[in-house]
């Protein structure tokens, strides 16, 4: 057995752990005067009623004991000066990771914090929303090829964020993150729904679109490089047309991890598909060659439902995306080239040491008022992340080790009790077309509303409390009042699409705000609401149905949808 693996096991062959919790650290909470509150660290994730411990330990997760390599208990940080800074001699690091060749090190080892940036994977999932204007532009296009063209540009532009080489923190099981756009255009919620494999789901809702992103990444270590493979699904619905888009993203390689200057390369095919029209974009991210001109280059075609090339796409994923349209006729003449997207250059002073610009830095912004309403599961309040952001690396590394040790103990407890852990806000179901889908139950935003009301009421007489510093999203344009449908259902008999119906609802003065529920094509589960004399139910079997008409008699009304059928009846 090599010296490396001897360090990982005891004499009896069982894995040994080098992680030890030696000290407690303050929690990043503040009172309304801006003074830091210093309870025991564990309360941040264990003692609160909304904490990971109380919310998730009772639920358990699938038995994964056999999936954990002995390397799971090996910690580099303790042998590198508590990871205060990167080791000068990278050869010493190679001695520790050399045995990982061909393995997935991200799931097998605990890395020191000098490898990290003060973000979690959940936060990074929302970085594509930096380019939300391209989705909004697509929604205004009258031609489906044009819509696909701008959504393709959106999916290329997002890679301009992925040049940083620092690693985000892995979310804990059940960890969450919320984000509300400062311009009020959308709201997003993320939850870590699985630990092995690591899967996080992000659900973004706006008046213009609904987007669900699944982060599911595996890696393979090759000595001085790391392959990164993405397996997650991405679903986008444009509310103006009811169109459903999905995409698959290319792979990546992180070069020169041990020796040389680290850099990231994306390669392979990006495929964006419109499931309503059958149109598809196939864009190739080219591998770098010997010459600089080939670096970060992309090119490909947008195809119509018959497989004919309609648009040629080219560019560099970190700089620009251009398009040249082909005519539909026999001549196949091309139009002039247009620029779909061009990177905005931020001034150097906008960036921090991790190369985060203003938008990315905004993901971690939280006033004391905002922090008061965040749940203890939110990525912003993780103390290892906070300490790293403050550049207190020694404390960050100790806190990270404590959190990981606590999570392993909770996992072992669940396994011993044979408990099955379930996410709080998403549920997984089988899907005949996509294999599976994740359904968002909307409860997080209801819980948040209650927290906001409670905090605002508690500090309403405090002159230092400014409720305007708590981000809010105007849900009136999204929510519907189920109990009020019957008395105004006749107003919608001419509605021809779910979007028109949705907009009609949004103009009403609602009597109450029930759980936010999107109308088709985003209906995902049964929703029922009842009063003393009235009951209504949504039934959903498809995401592609369109509203055809509404029929009503003295006792009931029925919404008629195109095949495959979705029925909605009330009595």
UniProtKB/Swiss-Prot annotation:
A GO cellular component annotation in the UniProt record: membrane
Biased composition (Polar residues): 33-42
Listed InterPro entries: OSBP_sf (IPR037239), Oxysterol-bd (IPR000648)
Composition bias type Low complexity, residue spans: 43-54
Keyword Protein biosynthesis: no
Keyword Coiled coil: yes
GO MF, one annotated term: sterol binding
Region (Disordered): 1-73
Top-rank lineage group of the source organism: Eukaryota
Coiled coil ranges: 387-420
Family in the record: Belongs to the OSBP family.
Name of protein: Oxysterol-binding protein 11
Organism of derivation: Dictyostelium discoideum
Lineage: Eukaryota, Amoebozoa, Evosea, Eumycetozoa, Dictyostelia
Gene of this entry: osbK
């Amino acid at each position: 057995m090599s010296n490396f693996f001897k360090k990982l096991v005891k004499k009896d062959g069982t894995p040994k752990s080098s992680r030890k919790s030696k000290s407690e650290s303050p929690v990043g909470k503040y009172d309304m005067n801006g003074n830091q509150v210093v309870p025991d660290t564990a309360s941040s994730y264990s003692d609160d009623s909304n904490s990971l411990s109380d919310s998730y330990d009772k639920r358990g997760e699938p038995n994964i004991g056999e999936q954990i390599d002995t390397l799971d208990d090996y910690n580099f940080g303790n042998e590198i000066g508590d990871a205060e800074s990167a080791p000068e001699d990278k050869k010493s690091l190679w001695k520790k990771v050399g045995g990982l060749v061909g393995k997935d090190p991200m799931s097998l080892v605990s890395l020191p914090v000098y490898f990290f940036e003060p973000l979690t994977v959940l936060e990074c999932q929302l970085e594509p929303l930096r380019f939300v204007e391209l989705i909004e532009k697509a929604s205004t296009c009258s031609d489906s090829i044009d819509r696909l063209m701008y959504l393709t540009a959106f999916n290329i532009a997002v890679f301009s964020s992925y040049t940083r080489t620092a690693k985000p923190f892995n979310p804990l099981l059940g960890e969450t993150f919320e984000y509300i756009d400062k311009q009020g255009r959308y709201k997003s919620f993320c939850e870590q729904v699985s630990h092995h494999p690591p899967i996080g789901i992000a659900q973004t809702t706006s008046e213009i679109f609904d987007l669900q992103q699944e982060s599911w990444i595996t890696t393979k270590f090759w000595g001085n490089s790391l392959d990164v493979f993405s397996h997650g699904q991405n679903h986008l619905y444009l509310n103006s047309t009811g169109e459903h888009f999905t995409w698959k993203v290319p792979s990546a390689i992180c070069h020169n991890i041990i020796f040389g200057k680290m850099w990231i390369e994306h390669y392979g095919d990006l495929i964006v598909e419109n499931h309503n029209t059958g149109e598809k974009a196939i864009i190739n991210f080219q591998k770098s060659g010997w010459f600089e001109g080939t670096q970060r280059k992309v090119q490909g075609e947008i195809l119509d439902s018959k497989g004919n090339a309609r648009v040629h796409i080219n560019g560099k994923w970190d700089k620009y995306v251009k398009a040249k349209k082909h005519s539909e006729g026999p001549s196949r003449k091309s139009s002039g080239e247009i620029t779909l997207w061009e990177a905005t250059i931020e001034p150097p002073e906008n960036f921090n040491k991790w190369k985060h610009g203003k938008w990315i830095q905004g993901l971690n912004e939280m006033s004391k008022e905002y922090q008061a309403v965040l749940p203890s599961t939110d990525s912003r309040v993780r103390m290892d992340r906070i300490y790293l952001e403050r550049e207190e690396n020694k404390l960050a590394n100790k806190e990270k080790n404590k959190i990981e040790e606590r999570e392993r103990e909770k996992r072992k407890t669940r396994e011993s009790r044979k408990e099955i852990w379930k996410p709080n806000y998403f549920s997984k179901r089988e899907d005949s077309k996509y294999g599976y889908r994740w359904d968002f139950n909307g409860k997080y935003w209801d819980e948040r509303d209650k927290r906001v009301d409670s905090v605002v009421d508690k500090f309403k007489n405090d002159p230092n409390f400014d409720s305007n510093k708590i981000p809010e999203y105007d849900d009136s344009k999204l929510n519907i009042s189920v109990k009020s449908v019957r008395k105004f259902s006749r107003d919608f008999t001419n509605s021809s699409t779910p979007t028109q119906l949705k907009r009609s609802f949004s103009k009403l003065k609602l009597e109450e705000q029930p759980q936010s529920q999107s109308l088709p094509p985003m209906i995902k589960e049964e929703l029922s609401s009842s009063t003393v004399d009235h009951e209504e139910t949504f039934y959903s079997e498809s995401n592609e149905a369109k509203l055809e008409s509404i029929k009503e008699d003295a006792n009931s009304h029925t919404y008629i949808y195109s095949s495959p059928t979705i029925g909605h009846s009330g009595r």
